[in-house]
């Protein structure tokens, strides 16, 4: 046996602990900006501690986890990483708010083949910005450098969020009934869904994503961060009784709206009530995508659908607009008269 063996280190195997520590130091200021009084302890412990807000009498915890999907590939190809952190938070907190839950805290998971501290810091800075928008604390996370699992420049991210709602105020769709109105909240773009189709459309059509569409580069519109609806919806819930909320994500209108409807109800949507943002028409045209497939894959300009009583409609729209939302009446609740629970009238 040779006495001149090379001494190997973790860094020789492709894992740079020093780079990981450097990242932690860079993101400490990000987490501080998101602090909530319920959070105890500092970043870096084995676990994060959080009390329940004292204002809740019968608190129920609501949890969710999500990712950004292949929008990451578009972001990596464009070398633009700041927006996907906001996307990550949005996909989680918007799922919580549809049940009436206030997001409390958020954790992230960042996995890569070779840690680029600048890229990772950009992503986490975006996560912090998203948490600020949602009013939740970024209390921890995991950075995994895994050589051989990912190409060096690639990464994946996942988010985990916990919120709280008063047990008597959970929004679950049980109070939905015919005659109620649907209010749409406008999206900022495709949000974080349908990007495998987006990429296929770009590939097949050969379209130049750096070209301008309505005065703005297409790539900017595709990478526009997902809108976070938390604060505007929480403000609405203070004033108006809401029967259901649907987050229009993967599966589009056809899949997501029925998730919050009773079996005997359907929605009747007036397609004339809004105009698709230009990026969706561009995708449909360049991919020759059918209308049905567009509504099955993309949000087509509608990020949330909220169900309220007819008498509360005007007040609800006004509150949402006062909090910066593009809100409008998009349709009605009706009795189901067939198999379909979503009817979109052109």
Curated annotation (Swiss-Prot):
Annotated signal sequence range: none
Domain of life: Bacteria
Gene3D superfamilies the record matches: PurM-like C-terminal domain, PurM-like, N-terminal domain
The UniProt record lists the keyword Acyltransferase: no
Any one cellular-component term (Gene Ontology): cytosol
Keyword terms of this UniProt record: ATP-binding, Cytoplasm, Ligase, Nucleotide-binding, Purine biosynthesis
Protein name: Phosphoribosylformylglycinamidine cyclo-ligase
Disulfide feature: none
NCBIfam families cross-referenced by the UniProt entry: purM (TIGR00878)
Membrane spanning stretches: none
Record EC number: 6.3.3.1
InterPro entries: PurM-like_C_dom, PurM-like_C_sf, PurM-like_N, PurM-like_N_sf, PurM_cligase
Pathway: Purine metabolism; IMP biosynthesis via de novo pathway; 5-amino-1-(5-phospho-D-ribosyl)imidazole from N(2)-formyl-N(1)-(5-phospho-D-ribosyl)glycinamide: step 2/2
Family, similarity comment: Belongs to the AIR synthase family.
GO biological process: 'de novo' IMP biosynthetic process; adenine biosynthetic process
GO molecular function: ATP binding; phosphoribosylamine-glycine ligase activity; phosphoribosylformylglycinamidine cyclo-ligase activity
Native organism: Alteromonas mediterranea (strain DSM 17117 / CIP 110805 / LMG 28347 / Deep ecotype)
Cell compartment(s), UniProt: Cytoplasm
Catalytic activity: 2-formamido-N(1)-(5-O-phospho-beta-D-ribosyl)acetamidine + ATP = 5-amino-1-(5-phospho-beta-D-ribosyl)imidazole + ADP + phosphate + H(+)
Taxonomic placement: Bacteria, Pseudomonadati, Pseudomonadota, Gammaproteobacteria, Alteromonadales
Keyword Ligase applies: yes
Pfam families attached to this UniProt entry: AIRS (PF00586), AIRS_C (PF02769)
